[in-house]
Amino acid sequence: MSGFSKFLDSIFAFFRSLYARPAPQPPVPPARDDINPPAVRVTQRVLLVAYNPLINPGTGQKLFDIMGWRTPESLCEGFMADIMETSAGLASFQVVEQAEINDILPFKDGFRYEPAALMDVLQRRAAPYRAEQVDYAELLARLDALRRVSAGDFDEVWVFGYPHAGFYESIMGGAGAFFCNSNPLTGTETCPRRLIVMGFSVERGVGEMLESFGHRCESIVRQVYAGQPAEANYFARFTRYDKVAPGMAEVGNVHFAPNSEKDYDWGNPRFVPSRCDDWFNFPNLGSSARQVNCDEWGKGEIRQHHIWWLRHFPHAAGQINGVANNWWRYLMDPNQVGKRL
């Protein structure tokens, strides 16, 4: 072939390349879910509310000072340290704002204590008013909580009240709210995020705060495993105790240790076989049972039992059937429940 012919062929090849269809490319596979999500740390931001009524306007005396109770700040310090420790550092609460309510909130039915009547109840000179609950709508409106949670100012609300104030240990509101040791708050669906209102008491201790949090945990993990087949419901297995599953105890629940025979029976010295240690290896279950009794969890002390119980909650990487092996992901942030990993 002459040089001129080669030149013409190169020219034709150039023009053909301008109008030719591009060579087909191999299809790009769809992005797949991370089948081994890491056990990431979760931090919940808290609005801390002291429900501390003004009892004597003349002297400025408020309820907490008159009664000599603990401060919310001192209780929070111990509670938050326990959560950090039991979660192996994967869960933490951060108080981002504090507020104080100095008048007396109404109950849901409209009843409201006068300061003198409230003191009579708290000092046991009169019987308490038996109402279903405090007016949560009034509380949330005062705090502008629905809008502010929607805006991301904070994630949940902790209210430190007093005996007979009408607060549940925990209650959930917002779009998609579900049972959280009490029925969901109605009229809160305008908030696109689930929010939890914890009800604590300055009359009590850190152990009782862990009790309230423990019931929150029970409700949330039950919701996580709702709809799972029985053999895949790991929380049902986690909560077994000897009284209802003889010889098959695992960790138990908030009220029942592995060997408990009644509610709050955390000081029972009876030995029973338990696979509680198995949960430190989750999801690789299969360890042998061993004999345990109350020596393991504080011999009846409420705080020590609840710390022991919470330490057993899984916090591993990965997932099974779409449920994260790190349960703290859900215990802290209810918006993770039902969310695709």
Model regions and ranges:
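Propeptide-to-catalytic entry region of secreted or membrane-anchored zinc metalloproteases
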Residues: 31-147, 168
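Active-site recognition of the HExxH zinc-binding catalytic motif
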Residues: 203-223
